[in-house]
From Swiss-Prot:
Species for this entry: Ralstonia pickettii (strain 12J)
GO process annotations (BP): translation
Pfam families: Ribosomal_L11, Ribosomal_L11_N
Identification of the protein by name: Large ribosomal subunit protein uL11
Keyword vocabulary terms for this entry: Methylation, Ribonucleoprotein, Ribosomal protein, RNA-binding, rRNA-binding
Length: 143
């Protein structure tokens, strides 16, 4: 028989830097989950990733105080800013352009995000990433 699910917890945690301080501790503590067990498991799974890269995670909490978690790919905006070499997007995205990425860079981001995107094919995924980039004030060359 399947375990009874008592809730889902969605967090964004920097890769390799999960610790019991907020937001992780309070979110897991409310459900009575073992915070250190989660932190150790999360840090072990994100060991190969770039340190500090925000990783969305969905934690499923069960009635017996156990849990499972699923990691998603990093947010597209973070990957776009990294590819463009900027710290933040434009305050006026459609008038002030703050950076550029190429179609090849957009394709790399689309491939990394493919599991989390609802696009039918790679070209549609690239257009989705290009739209996100444009709304951040970044031009996409080759589109």
């Amino acid at each position: 028989m399947a375990k009874k699910i008592i809730g889902f917890i969605k967090l964004q945690i920097p890769a390799g830097k999960a610790n019991p301080s907020p937001p992780v501790g309070p979110a897991l503590g409310q459900r009575g989950l073992n915070i250190m067990e989660f932190c150790k498991a999360f840090n072990a799974q994100t060991q190969g990733m770039e340190p500090g890269l925000p990783v969305p995670v969905v934690i499923t909490a069960f009635a017996d105080k156990s849990f499972t978690f699923v990691m998603k790919s990093p947010p597209a905006t973070v990957l776009i800013k990294k590819a463009a070499g900027i710290q933040k997007g434009s305050a006026k995205p459609h008038t002030d352009k703050v950076g550029k990425i190429t179609r090849a860079q957009a394709e790399e981001i689309a491939k990394a995000k493919n599991a989390d995107l609802t696009a039918a094919d790679l070209d549609a995924a690239v257009r989705t990433i290009a739209g996100s980039a444009r709304s951040m004030g970044i031009t996409v060359e080759g589109l």
